[in-house]
């Protein structure tokens, strides 16, 4: 519901936001406390089963195994013969409190890849949680946020005052 435009640029007429991106980053926020923070619950999933640092360490280990180029057909909702080989550049897992005076524990998983298949971010999160907690958990889409998209500099059109080489 809340979208903020931080910047904009004039681009080529041939620019396609979905095809010209070089990387996309998704953020998945999980409240691991039994009771969710009422101020952040609209944008945070609640999975109170993740409680120990050893489980978070197991999630980190599973995340490390996904970094690189892999065929993600099994971790997507793709039914058509679309290219399923994608490269994950980085997966970071952090476990903290939402604020210093807060008793709510927050697990944040950030996934950066060259591209994502349909439902791939959710299935990656479910895979990581299964490896860490050894329990099947369905991803609540409330915790998934598109954090950023990176485009090459060549997509921008030079401004009227600049010289084109």
Where are these regions (language model features)?
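Structured-RNA-binding interfaces characteristic of tRNA pseudouridine synthases
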Residues: 1-165
């Amino acid at each position: 519901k809340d979208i903020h435009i931080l910047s904009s640029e004039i681009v080529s007429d041939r620019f396609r936001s979905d095809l010209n991106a070089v990387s996309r980053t998704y953020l998945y926020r999980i409240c691991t406390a039994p009771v969710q923070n009422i101020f952040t619950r609209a944008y945070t999933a609640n999975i109170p089963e993740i409680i120990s640092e050893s489980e978070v360490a197991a999630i980190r280990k599973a995340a490390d195994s996904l970094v690189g180029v892999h065929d993600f057909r099994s971790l997507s909702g793709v039914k058509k013969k679309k290219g399923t080989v994608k490269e994950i550049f980085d997966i970071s897992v952090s476990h903290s409190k939402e604020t210093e005076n807060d008793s709510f524990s927050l697990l944040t998983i950030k996934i950066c890849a060259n591209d994502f298949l349909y439902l791939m971010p959710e299935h990656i999160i479910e895979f990581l949680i299964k490896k860490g907690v050894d329990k099947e958990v369905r991803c609540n889409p409330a915790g998934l946020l598109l954090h950023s998209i990176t485009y090459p500099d060549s997509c921008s059109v030079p401004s009227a005052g600049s010289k084109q080489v």
